[in-house]
């Protein structure tokens, strides 16, 4: 990211840091926030659970199955379609708190707070085992607990 900013010779490039994509790559989102510092301008709270299958398939599990045109599919735009996720995937997107506990998320929020005390964090919910409201409620509850553990007041939203 630093190289991109340097080559572009600009100061208006920033990172929307999505912890989930770092988790499945076995990266530490807290360390990444502290490394990128002021380049992080927004964050997404989405969790990942690495499953035992990762020991055999690795995190680059490529057992996704292309859906046949006769199967119900989700169009991603143009001629791009979502594939079928492996039944026993190496990792899964899960609601915040189902992959990493509130203490971990407290560290994540603290790192973001060090960069910008008014940093906005949005919840991304892709846990297919939970309904849309249930997943958001769980994530919000874990993040509120994490903020409390980190000593970050969330009583007022900026702006």
Residues covered by each model-derived region:
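Histidine-acidic metal/acid-base catalytic patches
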Residues: 1-17, 21-159
